[in-house]
Amino acid sequence: MFGVIGTCRWDVTDDKTLVISPLEGEEGVLVESVWPWQESDIRKVELIGKIVAPEHMTYMFYNCHMLEDAGSLKKLDVSRVYNIRGMFAGCSLLKDISFLENWDTGRVADISYLFFGCASLKSVSPLGKWDTKNLRRADGVFEGCVSLADISGLRNWDTGNIMTMKFMFYKCMLLEDISPLSGWDTKNLVFASYTFFGCMQLRDISALGSWNTRKVMEMSHMFENCASLKDISPLSGWNTGSATEMHAMFCECISLNDISPLRGWNTENVRLMSHMFYGCGITDAGAVDGWNIKSLYSLAEIFRNTCVKENPFVKKVPMACPETGSFTAWKKCCDGKIVELLIPEDARRSSAFGKKCRCDKAKVLGIQKPNGLPALTAVSCNDRNFVYRLGKTVSAPDFDTDRFSECAAGIHFFMDRKSAEDYSS
C-alpha cells in the first residue's frame, strides 16, 4: 500500500510500518486528506526527512488499533496546524505519547477526541509543555481512556479560551486525582455535559471549587455514574445563573447522600432537570426546596430510585387537571379519532408542566371520527393493543405515579377538546 499526499510519498512496509518521506529533496508538505491508512493495522510510524503537517490533521490515525510506536512524529513540523481533532482516536494500543512533548501547538484550536478510545494510555504528562492559549474545543479529548490515571501534565494548561469540554474525561474509570485541574481558567466555558461521566474512582472534586462557571449552560450528565463521589461541597459556590440543562447531572452517584451544598444554586434558567439525582443515596431533598423552577419543562424521575419520600417541587407546580373529583376530558387516538372520557373520582391522576395529563382509569363517553361521524372503537397511538370502546371503562395498571414523568405510563388526556385535536404524538 502506497501513495502520494501533497509533496510526500507514503508507504506501508511488510512489517506494518507507515513511512512518510518527501517526494523530492529534503522537505515534504502534507495536505489535508482522507488519510488512506485509517483503520489499518499499521504498528509504527516513521518520518524520513522534514515533513510539514497541514492545517488540519483530523482523525489522521483513526482506528489504527495496532499502532504502538509513533515516536517518529516528534519530528513532524506542526507549526501550521490548528486542528488535530481525533488524530489518535481508536489507537487502543498507544501507550507512549512522549513524542508529543515538544510539539508547537500555539495555533491549535481544536483537540476534540484527540485520544478517544486510547485504552492503554495511562499518563498524559508529555502534554505539560503544550501551548494551549488558542484552544477553543476540547470535547472528548480523553474519552474512553479507561487506563488513564495521571493527568498531572494538564496542570499548567491555558484554558481561558476553551468554550466546550463535553465528554472530556468520559469513562476514565481509573481517574481519581483531578487536582491538576484546580487552576484551570474556565471563564469562557459554555458546554460541560458528560465531562466526568463514568469516572467511577473520582472521590475528591475540590479542584473544581475554583472553576468559573458563570457562562456554563450545559451541565447534563456531568458527574453521572461517579459511583465513589460522596462530597459535592466544592460545588456550593458555583455560579449557575446561565445553566439551562442539568439532566442526569448526578445520576447513579450511588455514594452521594447529601445535596445540601447545592442549596444556593441559581436555577432560574434551567429547563431540564430530569433524572438529576436518579439512583443517588439521598433520603431528603429538602435542601433544594428553594430552587427556582420557573423555566423548567422536565423534572421527570429527578428522585427516582432514591429514598426521597417527598418531592419538594410537587407543591410548586399545580396540576393541569382537577386533583379531586370526577371530570370529563379528551384524547386523540389513531386515525385522528377524538375520544371523550369521564375520569372517575377514584382515578389516580397526574400532570407535569404542560397541558397533557394522565390517569389510571377512565370511561369512554364518546368517539368521533375526523369527519364528525361517531365510532365504536379507537386505538391508542402509542399502544396498538390498547383499545377504547364506547361505553366501556379502560384502565392502565402500570400507571406511573411520578408527577413529572409526562410521557410515562397511563391514559393520556387533555382538559379541552381543541388541545386534544391539535396534539401530535
Locations of regions flagged by a protein language model:
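Short, glycine-biased loop/turn motifs at secondary-structure junctions and
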Residues: 311-425
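Negatively charged
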Residues: 1-348
